Amino acid sequence: MEKIRVYELAKQLNVSTKDLMSKLKDNKIEVKSHMSTLDKDQIAKVKSFYEKQKKVQTSQNNSKSNDENKKITNKNTEKTTEKISTVDSNKQNNSNKRFKPKHPRNNDEESVSHFDKIKHKNKSEMNEKRDLNDKKKNKNFKNTKNKNSNNNKNSKNNKNNKNNDHNRKDEAIKHETKEPKKFIIQPTITVKDLSEKISVSISELIMKLMELGIMANQNQEIDFDTASLVAGEFDVIVEQDEVEDFDDDDVFNLDFEDKKEDLKERPPVITVMGHVDHGKTSILDRIRNSRVAGREAGGITQHIGAYTIRVNDKKIVFLDTPGHEAFTAMRSRGAQVTDVSILVVAADDGVMPQTIEAINHSKAAGVPIIVAINKIDKENANIERVKTELAENGLVPEDWGGDTVLVPVSARTGEGIDDLLEMILMVAEMEELKANPNRLAVGTVIEAQLDKGRGPTATILVQKGTLKHSDMVFSGQASGRIRAMFNDQGKQVKKAGPSTPVLILGLNEVPEAGDMIYAVKDEKEARNYAQKIKDHNREEQIKSSSTMNLDELFGKISDGETKDLNIIIKTDVKGTIDAIKQSLIKLSNEEVKVNIIHGAVGGITESDVNLASASSAIIIGFNVRPTQVAMDMAKNESIEIRTYRVIYDAIEDVKNAITGMLKPQYQEEVLGRATVRDTFKVPGVGTVAGVYVNTGKVTRNATVRLLRDEILIFEGPVSSLKRYKDDVKELTQGYEGGMGLENYNDIKPGDVLEAYVLNEVQR
């Protein structure tokens, strides 16, 4: 028998790698990781241990089944005894029914005593016979009432006394036999829903609420205490539905395990991780022969991208994750859906903090790691130093006696890229990656954003099943029918199988990045699942917001001079919100607390300024700009709005402001805004925009931001400014003219051009 790795033996024994490694340690077999190899003697020793364990479990299961058979026999005996006693009691009841008493009063007493006997019977017997006994009682009672009225016509006093006695017994019987209705409701419910639940008209319910001093319309939500109080006025009991902490997989049971015979081979999903600027996107550029890095601000990947390539007629899916520590959550999501992790380390820089973090993410996900040592073409490259630092962090190279695959590469020259791809396919083949394509799809949302023209969009990675055009899906509280799907090259596709990244359209709102996405049978099922999650999230938000406000209030009282820095975040994509949030909250210290009071996708609007004014907050925009109305309102309300294109600048500014070191050298002055009415292509010059100046002025030496739906598209200097055929230094409000942007031609009618200058401020 040849040597095999730990994780391969775990698959053969049908146990988890973690469990196998613990058993190896118990048997004094030393292994470093799941990639370690075992010899023939060690394999035989482990297999014999698990065979003994299986025999013990089998004997225990047999003994348990014998005990259960005995219990079933005893239960059957008890049921037979209960049936016999039930027959006897029925006979006794029938004999009582045939007996006609001489005096009505005695008959009343027997009816009541008969009810008391039934009341104290076993609960199971009560449930079977309650309706029959009630009918008998009512029948006996009516006969008694008739006899009372006929026998006592000549005696008025006797009649009154006996009728009063009868009424008391009638009320007692009704009180004991009639139980109030019970309903289960959510912790919060609208007045309309409550009226339908307890079968009371809306007008009656609103009137009763007004009597209790509560003014509410039919669409207004009331809490459980209020609902319980008003329901009690209608002799109805309501109970609160317990909202449990749940995971999508546990509650919906949609991500079930497939049968082995249904599984088919699927492409591997590769996550590229590493420290910022170590060359992750550049390596993907070389592999895909595209220029993604050139389009990112500062050459840094801002959002997760998913790409499919072909190598030797086999597909490989790459996830490109940002390297900065602000994107911890995004990298963690990438590790959860990946099969092989590529750790990029610069040969001239070595292991950095985010490199260690990426190692931990990959180890926690239990995926094999391939180290790509990049930038080996540089003069100060030191591969041996990188190997030493990797070994110190638990990744021992193969040529040093370890099990970590190291591939020296150069993204600039292309050296070693083919070797890296071969190693990826080799490791993926050892993993035996399979999935069932013939089932409803299950996947993960990699990124999501709101597009003005197409609505909510989501980049997803299908993990199981096949996602098809027109499928009903839900992800978190978002749901809808897929109207269109696009692959990573922008081409429309009709279906996507396992390990396929696609951009989908058709959801009713933007899902959360990292959420699972499920395909279901019909629209009703998708809406129900999404609504259930929405209700759960709303309850959690109500709880957290009320608790947070109280903590904030008491915190200020106890801390005395504690200051809070409230921040509102607006970004162009949803995944960036969490990244900025985590980074800014970490900046809190003993003197200043950073509170993120709101975060959303889209441009900065007047509602954001109103919220900032009410909560004394500053607004931070990332790749977005405020509307003109929002800018004017912020100026009047003295609200600070800061916009950024690179996340590090935002973090550094807030950090410096907290520590009191922020001394701005330049202050931005917005000169004016112009709207693009038409565009013209001029040979040798490029695209020239015909603009109309709405506010302020546009000058020749100004820097211009091109905004499309308040999203920042381009920022750069003005290349030309004309009025008719003449070059001018400025265009003022109410005038039209032509404007060209330096090295940028993708201008469209309806775009807004915002001109500004930076004025030096004395320190």
Swiss-Prot record:
Q: Where is the composition biased (Basic residues)?
A: 136-145
Region labeled G1 — which residues? Answer: 274-281
Which positions does UniProt annotate for GTP binding? 274-281, 320-324, 374-377
G4: annotated segments: 374-377
Region (G5) location: 410-412
Annotated region (Disordered) at 52-178
What GO cellular component term, any one, is given?
cytosol
List, in alphabetical order, the Gene Ontology terms for molecular function in this entry: GTP binding; GTPase activity; translation initiation factor activity
Q: Which segments carry the region annotation G3?
A: 320-323
From which domain of life does this come?
A: Bacteria
Record field: compositional bias (Low complexity) = 146-161
Protein name, as recorded: Translation initiation factor IF-2
